[in-house]
Structure formats: structure tokens, C-alpha cells
């Protein structure tokens, strides 16, 4: 598939800590940049910020993962950023950032509204709070197990909205040779 114009993709997550969500965010940012697309990441700074910046991604150090009453203000900021930067896709990778993203997008006219993607990284508690992760135009499940979790616990989610994209290990950055002694 050839795109007529480069995409602008915004990823939302709590913080650039060291973990699978965060590492995946940096990898997606890198892949987007290498393919000529524009990557924007919105989250609180953390140990992977330098890695993210090396991808050429734009970084907004906003604490959108803090469970605090004032965090709601970031929904307006995300909305304004989507409009000013002409974001094509918003990809939420965690529940609180997803709530902020969903609220932000609900205030954008349909013709200017980015595509809404969520990734379910684990079997969250089944609750109204977690249900936001099922609100994506497309929902990425990181394994068949997670896909089954979604279909079992959220029967209203249409199967054609769920895409399974298994996580993997980059052998170039991880030593896969080990022994029992290690």
C-alpha cells in the first residue's frame, strides 16, 4: 500500500519507563520515522526518553498517566495538539491516557478527527474503567490470549475491529544466548 502523504501518528502512554509498552512505543516511533512518517509521543519523561528522541520522534512531556483530578486538563491539550499538528492516528497504549485521548477526540468534528487505535497489552480488570481500551476504531491485541480475553469479556466488540499483532524480541538488541548458570 502506497500512501499519498506521510502520516502523523500520536502515541499516548503514561510514562517512558522501562517495559514492554514503552519499548514498543519507541520501536513504533522508530519504524514510523524510518518510513517517512511523523511520530508524536505524549507521556511523562522516563529512562527511554533519549531512545525515543533518537528516533526523530517529537516528544511532549505531559504527565497523562497520573491519577489526579488535574490530569483531565490534558484532554484539551491533546485535542489542540491533534488539530494543530493535523494528527491522522491517535494510538492509546494505556487506560488513563486512553480516557484522555477518547475525551479529546470526542470534541473534534468527524471530518477532522483522527483514527482512534488502542492496544490491549494485558488482561485488565473487567470494568468500566478498562472498557475504554475496547473503544478503538481498531483494537490491537498483543497475543491470541489477549484477543480471546477481549472477545470473552467484552462481547460487544466486533471481531473485525480486533487485530492480533504478537510482540516479539529483537535479537539485535537482546542476547538470547544464556545458560542455566546465568
Predicted regions and their residues:
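Membrane-interface segments of envelope glycosyltransferases acting on lipid-linked substrates or membrane lipids
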Residues: 1-182
